[in-house]
Amino acid sequence: MPHSLNVNYSFLSKFKKHVSSSVVLIACTILALIFANIPVVKEWYFSLWQHPMAVSVGGFNLFSHGGHSMNVMMVINDFLMAIFFLSVGLEIKREILVGELSSMKKALLPIIGACGGMLVPVLVFALFCPANAAMQRGLAIPMATDIAFSLGVLSVFKTRVPVSLKVFLAALAVADDLGGIIVIALFYSSDLSWLYLGLSALCVAVMIIANISKVRAKSFYLVVGLVLWYMMLNSGIHATISGVIVALCIPATLKKGTGHYLERIRMQISKFPVIDVDDLHKTVVLTHNEIHMLKSIESAADKMISPLQDLEDSLHGVINFFVIPLFAFANAGVDLSQMSIGGLFSGVGLAVMLGLVVGKFLGVFTFSWIAIKTKIVTLPAGISWNAFASVCVVCGIGFTVSMFIADLSYSALGEAGITLLNEAKLGVLCGSVISAVLGCVLLSRTLPKEDC
């Protein structure tokens, strides 16, 4: 029973967190498009991201790569997104340990759906994208499902959405993120430096040994993680992967059992003097001993939360209300004057859009349908096939990770890459909007009606 409560809390709390942040994300996306297309601020908007940044100590600059300072856009896409992937990694680790990916029975349907949702969009992209080596670099763009936007769509329907449907979508998005991380690590690394790779491995070894030695201080892992980020930045492996590695090394267990800390709290509370009813609304000056007891209770309560969950909770606000909105504001700005409508309906833009709208739905639904019909898994309780299909449409909302992979795919190709990147971004935006609107229409028709 406690485990069941844990899982429900995990997904329902995640649902509430992401739906509020999706509004901020939409606002920043719209602002980016406005700023990128209004002549008065357009030049300022695009030049803003090219300003060099430095965090220097003596002659050492943390934000440097290959001897050159990083600009604002690089810091957002390489450093802040590493923090985003740290959060994603913590989420994946928690779900594997105690959540919806903790057993094969629970994890199988979202994993099978995610596999289809990654494979088929790639095939659709390859089918509609011209056989050009530069264009084909974006094969992985339509693979991702944006958890904030997709859960935001479900939030529109409030209590009409069965919990099992929310759980499926959230678990699929987590599995999707894991697939995206693997793709980034394998296919977006280049010019490997064995020296920096060796130093990166040393950082990982230090964190693993610290975990085994029961080092529970989050600050230790974050400091070593910062060093790891710099080493990976210069190693040739994409630096954002460092966030996932740090997440996997952060302890998910307590130093002592929960019972030990609960008993300590109960003991201190029992010793605390009873406050007279008449004094409840008065300012009470505590003795040193009472302050010590309260601090002891606070310390024990803090130690009942594992470093993994504590850090995940602490990062929530930073990720959802700073990192992702800033990423959207920096990356969603597409100069529409440089593009034609025909550009969207050909080449990269069309391939990305169809990969998200058609590929995602076909992949998630078809793979899930086959698995259910062959009795490998079962359809989640309380869900009709029509409602399930509607949620598969919502899976085509691919924003954050899709935009990120688009940048990795085309940003290094010079002038030609800028055009392809803009087409890809527009494809992501259009595909995501179509999937969201279509998903809303279908869900409104297929979900159970609210009781009057």
PLM region spans:
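Alpha-helical transmembrane segments of multi-pass membrane proteins
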Residues: 29-44, 331
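Structural signature of hydrophobic alpha-helical transmembrane segments
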Residues: 74-85, 133-148, 189-202, 240, ...
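Entry/N-cap segments of selected transmembrane alpha helices
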Residues: 95-123, 193-202, 338-359, 385-392, ...
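C-terminal ends of transmembrane helices
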Residues: 6-13, 86-102, 151-162, 205-216, ...
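Hydrophobic transmembrane alpha-helices of secondary-active transporters
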Residues: 59-65, 69, 73-98, 318-339, ...
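Functional cores that coordinate and move charged inorganic groups
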Residues: 154-266
